[in-house]
Curated annotation (Swiss-Prot):
Organism: Brassica oleracea var. italica (Broccoli)
Pfam families (UniProt xref): Tryp_alpha_amyl
Protein name: Non-specific lipid-transfer protein A
Function summary: Plant non-specific lipid-transfer proteins transfer phospholipids as well as galactolipids across membranes. May play a role in wax or cutin deposition in the cell walls of expanding epidermal cells and certain secretory tissues.
PROSITE patterns per record: PLANT_LTP
Keywords: Disulfide bond, Lipid-binding, Signal, Transport
Family: Belongs to the plant LTP family.
PANTHER family: NON-SPECIFIC LIPID-TRANSFER PROTEIN 2-RELATED (PTHR33076)
Gene, per the UniProt record: WAX9A
């Protein structure tokens, strides 16, 4: 019985330690990209800003609660913006948060210093 209790305590301790580590890795570039995917047509071609874009930006902003999450989101957005290359309209990309009424703590750009994002 004492062996079972020791094992249970060890498992519980591992869960407590691993829980925050797993939570910190919840925001991936896949998650970021899927939320901003509805914005790509607007960024590259213009037109009307889709409601789904604003929904995605708002959802992403609410998921990025911690500094590491916001820095990760920044890096993912920076990489995605670079991938668009010459098709990127930087002004449209940077204006999305304001147009959607979302306060984002960093500009959507290819040259944001994501390490400074808090």
């Amino acid at each position: 019985m004492a062996g079972v209790m020791k094992l249970a305590c060890l498992v519980l301790a591992c869960m407590i330690v691993a829980g925050p580590i797993t939570a910190n890795r919840a925001l991936t570039c896949g998650t970021v990209n899927s939320n901003v995917a509805p914005c790509i047509g607007y960024i590259t071609q213009g037109g009307t800003l889709p409601g789904a874009c604003c929904t995605g930006v708002s959802k992403l902003n609410s998921m990025a609660r911690t500094t590491p999450d916001r820095q990760q989101a920044c890096r993912c957005l920076e990489t995605a913006a670079r991938a668009l290359g010459p098709n990127l309209n930087a002004g449209r990309a940077a204006g999305i948060p304001k147009a959607c009424g979302v306060s984002v703590p960093f500009p959507i750009s290819t040259n944001t210093n994501c390490n400074n994002v808090k």
